């Protein structure tokens, strides 16, 4: 079986070449060809000796996930569905803005965490993505988006906020992050790469030590009672532990704040009292808030907060001195908005079946 070199960061690729009797510097050459030139076969790598190209063709491969579908929203948002085998597909979304181009990348086929307001969570869970399947999303998007008139890459920022919980696929995500940051890969700065987590505290500590990129935390509640209901992981790592982990992370973080993501659910977490509880909760954590109007999906059981409730909630936080943004809903006409990514998941958890039974019971 051939070795897919897309699974290696520079350290791994260097080790691979050394193990196969080749000069270690070849790793940098091959990495640049794969990630900066978008090469898909070794014959394109003209600065490698023919004998090495032949050897690589015999022993190795560059396997990119295949494109299943591409869509473009009326607002310029683009979504790609990529085939990761055995009937599974993951979604990657590009969001254009005036000062940046952000790519939202998936880390798992489905998600095991069962956050109740998230479409991905309803799809169940199949498996972790490999490092090649994670970085392959950036490879595809770079190929599709090209460069600006100034010969700069259109994709300037990456957020690990697609399908799945990145911290639950720690090793493969870290390898992909290493490729993103490497000057022989995509050359992104740590400040422009963000990992989002629902609050896996031990993995937050590990990421701080090995790959401290910008951090976003899917908070979504101001107290344990509400968060236990909508983010079940909170029962394992309650808010007090999560806030302490955020403080520890900031010691090595490239930014001096944590971004707290907060989906606005009508009547659940969007009242003035919740905003005041939030202020008390995060008082020792330098942070900013990203309020996310809930993006409906069929049979979710939730409603989007009213614009008035979102405004009042935002104003309370701002008056307390916090930086607060209300996320614009982008790509909702192609189901590319936050919380809508579902891909194609061959569920191994029977979660889809469970939700169908619940819905049938409600209808009965």
From Swiss-Prot:
InterPro entries the record matches: Aldolase_TIM, Methyltransferase_A, RlmN_N, RNA_MTrfase_RlmN, rRNA_lsu_MTrfase_RlmN/Cfr, rSAM
Subcellular location: Cytoplasm
UniProt cofactor note: Binds 1 [4Fe-4S] cluster. The cluster is coordinated with 3 cysteines and an exchangeable S-adenosyl-L-methionine.
GO molecular function: 4 iron, 4 sulfur cluster binding; metal ion binding; rRNA (adenine(2503)-C2-)-methyltransferase activity; rRNA binding; tRNA (adenine(37)-C2)-methyltransferase activity; tRNA binding
UniProt domain Radical SAM core: residue ranges: 97-333
Protein origin, superkingdom: Bacteria
Keywords: 4Fe-4S, Cytoplasm, Disulfide bond, Iron, Iron-sulfur, Metal-binding, Methyltransferase, rRNA processing, S-adenosyl-L-methionine, Transferase, tRNA processing
GO biological process: rRNA base methylation; tRNA methylation
Record: residues binding [4Fe-4S] cluster: 111, 115, 118
One CC-aspect GO term: cytoplasm
S-S bonds: 104-338
Matching PROSITE patterns: RADICAL_SAM
EC code: 2.1.1.192
Cofactors demanded by this protein: [4Fe-4S] cluster
Purpose: Specifically methylates position 2 of adenine 2503 in 23S rRNA and position 2 of adenine 37 in tRNAs. m2A2503 modification seems to play a crucial role in the proofreading step occurring at the peptidyl transferase center and thus would serve to optimize ribosomal fidelity.
More details: Reaction proceeds by a ping-pong mechanism involving intermediate methylation of a conserved cysteine residue.
UniProt-recorded name of the protein: Dual-specificity RNA methyltransferase RlmN
């Amino acid at each position: 079986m051939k070795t897919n070199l897309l699974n290696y960061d520079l350290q791994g690729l260097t080790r691979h070449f050394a193990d196969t009797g080749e000069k270690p510097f070849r790793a940098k050459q091959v990495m640049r060809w794969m990630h900066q030139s978008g090469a898909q076969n070794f014959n394109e790598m003209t600065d490698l000796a023919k004998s090495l190209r032949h050897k690589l063709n015999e022993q190795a491969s560059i396997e990119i996930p295949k494109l299943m579908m591409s869509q473009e929203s009326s607002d310029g948002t683009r979504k790609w569905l990529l085939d990761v085998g055995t009937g599974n597909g993951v979604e990657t979304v590009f969001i254009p803005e005036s000062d940046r181009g952000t790519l939202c990348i998936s880390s798992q086929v489905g998600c095991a965490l069962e956050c109740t307001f998230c479409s991905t969570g309803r799809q169940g869970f199949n498996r972790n993505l490999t490092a090649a399947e994670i970085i392959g999303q950036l490879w595809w998007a770079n190929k599709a988006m090209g460069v600006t008139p100034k010969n700069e890459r259109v994709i300037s920022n990456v957020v690990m906020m697609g399908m799945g919980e990145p911290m639950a696929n720690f090793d493969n995500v870290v390898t992909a992050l290493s490729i993103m940051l490497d000057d022989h890969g995509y050359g992104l700065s740590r400040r422009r790469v963000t990992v989002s987590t629902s609050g896996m505290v031990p993995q937050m500590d590990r990421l701080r030590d090995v790959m401290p990129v910008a951090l976003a935390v899917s908070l979504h509640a101001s107290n344990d009672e509400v968060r236990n209901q909508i983010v079940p992981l909170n029962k394992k790592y309650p808010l007090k532990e999560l806030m302490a982990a955020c403080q520890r992370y900031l010691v090595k973080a490239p930014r001096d704040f944590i971004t707290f993501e907060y989906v606005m659910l009508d009547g659940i977490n969007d009242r003035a009292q919740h905003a005041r509880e939030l202020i008390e909760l995060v008082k020792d954590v330098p942070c900013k808030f990203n309020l996310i109007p809930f993006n409906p999906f069929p049979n979710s059981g939730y409603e989007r907060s009213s614009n008035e409730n979102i405004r009042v909630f935002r104003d309370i936080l701002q008056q307390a001195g916090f930086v607060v943004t209300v996320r614009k809903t982008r790509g909702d006409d192609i189901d590319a908005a936050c919380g809508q990514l579902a891909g194609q998941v061959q569920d191994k958890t029977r979660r889809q079946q469970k939700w169908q039974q619940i819905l049938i019971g409600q209808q009965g």
